[in-house]
A protein has these predicted regions:
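Conserved donor-binding loop and adjoining core beta-sheet/short helix segment
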Residues: 151, 155-260, 366-396
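Core SAM-dependent methyltransferase catalytic element
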Residues: 123-143
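A short glycine-rich, Lys/Arg-flanked "PGG" loop and its adjoining helix->strand segment in the class I
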Residues: 86-99
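Conserved alpha-helix/loop element of class I SAM-dependent methyltransferases that forms part
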Residues: 13-33
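Short amphipathic alpha-helix that is part of the acyltransferase structural core
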Residues: 142-177, 183-192, 224, 305-345, ...
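Conserved beta-strand signature within the Rossmann-like core of class I S-adenosyl-L-methionine
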Residues: 99-107
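A short acidic, Gly/Pro-enriched loop at the edge of an enzyme's catalytic core
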Residues: 65-76
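Active-site/acyl-donor-binding loops of N-acyltransferases
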Residues: 135-137, 206, 262-309, 366, ...
């Protein structure tokens, strides 16, 4: 047993010497200062640090280092930390001065990178460098903590949302989006000051994408990201990846994305899009395919009764989604290739149960068979066509449904229909163009932005992705 312990100590000394000798740690800890080195075998690292001008004290167990005064150290170096990580990081933070450095050196894979990133964020550290070979993390003590949602946070989230987006969001709407989603709840990361004030927020809700490409059919878990915001008083804290939003995004990616979803996506513009692409690995797929139908110029006349009967189409306004919509999705999804899984469970949550939004839901039937559906919202003289799914074997169902909708008393004021109409699948865009839809610049210069995790979907997105406004949180 004694020989085994000696071999283990020798192995650890070699690993630490290789990764954290005078060529490495002086770069990570550039200013000579007071350092506590916590290691089962502190030599030769202690000597290397002392030679670089640091005042070095050592301990084998940080939790037992009671002789060190609070907020007295410039740096703490942890070598292969053992024990409850949360307690260890809390103890290190207590001993560090403001802006003090924490270096973590791991010579074994026992310390999981994801767990460490989350723990550092939640303990009040900003990560300066991470994943250096071998596992070396450098962090700095800060006066903000990043963590996932806790009960009651919505009391600060909703006022911040109102201030950030100039829109009033009810508690019912927030609960629907983040508590009642059938595919997962409370995917929220937040930064708080030491006084408990919400400083930054990043969130998303789970969706499932259905893919049928090259004979393969599968489901891709994803997150639709939105509600990205920072309290104006704290926007000066850090820059880029060390800003409060950057730290919150890193926590979110580690806690909710890596190893859990294929990708996340969202629709944004301006500063947040530039930030996402510069600092958190986002890519812009394309400008949004904004299309407008001028109702006065391109009237969609209803067919006469005789022709209508012969064609066999019937359009109904509906209130809920049932098993017929599951059957439609199974039947037509191969024609769309890649899209959010629009089954009855998702549609019922997304549209039938969504509070504070008046959606108009329509279904079109050929004889007794469901061949398509659509969802609309009315905004003054604009009718927003937010979602749709049609059987391509019944292309006239699109015109039949739109004509019936425009003829309904609820929509008599509509002068335009606006929609995001992708060029994928080709028949879908072709049908829209044949009805008179025209491409226009998207009013807010929004783009489709995504971040891959474990699966890079860009090539498949460009070839096959179908989406509409209802796939965002903007509809």
């Amino acid at each position: 047993m004694e020989d085994t312990n000696k071999e283990e100590k020798a192995r650890m000394n070699r690993a630490v010497a290789d990764s954290a000798d005078s060529r490495t740690l002086p770069v990570l800890l550039p200013s000579p200062g007071s350092i506590l080195l916590v290691s089962a075998a502190p030599d030769p690292l202690a000597a290397e640090l002392a030679a670089a001008g640091h005042s070095v004290s050592t301990a084998k167990d940080l939790l037992a280092a009671n002789s060190t005064s609070e907020a007295s150290l410039d740096a703490v170096v942890l070598v292969d930390p053992r024990g409850p990580l949360t307690d260890i990081l809390r103890a290190a933070r207590r001993l560090l001065r403001e802006k003090g450095r924490l270096a973590i050196l791991a010579s074994t894979p026992d310390l999981k990178a994801r767990e460490l990133v989350v723990a550092l964020s939640e303990a009040g550290f900003v990560i300066l460098k991470g994943g250096l070979p071998p596992t070396v993390y450098l962090a700095r003590k800060e006066s903000f903590f990043v963590r996932e949602y806790a009960a009651g946070d919505e009391e600060q989230i909703l006022p911040m949302f109102r201030k950030s987006f100039h829109v009033e969001r009810s508690l019912a709407r927030w609960s629907w989006e983040y508590r009642e989603n059938p595919y997962g709840t409370l995917r929220i990361s937040e930064a708080f000051s030491e006084e408990g004030q919400l400083a930054a927020h990043y969130a998303g809700y789970p969706v499932r994408f259905h893919r049928e490409i090259e004979g393969r059919s599968d489901t891709l878990p994803a997150l639709q990201v939105g509600d990205t915001m920072t309290e104006p008083a704290f926007r000066h804290v850090g820059r880029g990846p060390t800003s409060l939003l950057g730290r919150t995004v890193r926590h979110y990616y580690t806690r909710f994305c890596e190893g859990q979803v294929a990708f996340n996506y969202g629709f944004n513009t301006g500063n947040i899009q530039r930030f996402s692409m510069s600092f958190v690995g986002a890519r812009r797929l394309e400008d949004l395919p904004f299309q407008v139908l001028d109702v006065a110029r391109q009237r969609l006349a209803l067919p006469n009764r005789l022709l209508g009967r012969l064609a066999g189409y019937r359009v109904e306004r509906i209130a809920h989604f049932d098993a017929r919509f599951d059957e439609l999705f199974r039947r037509v999804s191969p024609s769309y290739r890649l899209l959010v899984e629009r089954d009855a469970r998702y549609l019922e949550w997304r549209y039938a149960r969504c509070p504070d939004a008046e959606y108009f839901l329509y279904a079109v039937f050929r004889r007794r068979r469901l061949v398509g559906w659509s969802v609309f919202r009315a905004k003054a003289e604009r009718l927003i066509w937010g979602d749709a799914l049609f059987d391509p074997h019944y292309p006239d169902a699109v015109r039949q449904l739109l004509a019936r909708v425009l003829a309904a008393p609820d929509h008599s004021q509509a002068k335009t229909i606006e929609a995001w109409i992708t060029s994928r699948p080709a028949w879908w865009r072709e049908k829209a163009v044949s009805l008179g839809f025209e491409s226009r610049p998207e009013p807010d210069d929004l783009g489709f932005v995504f971040v891959p995790f474990g699966h890079d979907p860009e090539e498949e997105f460009r070839a096959h992705l179908y989406y509409m406004m209802g796939d965002s949180d903007l509809f």
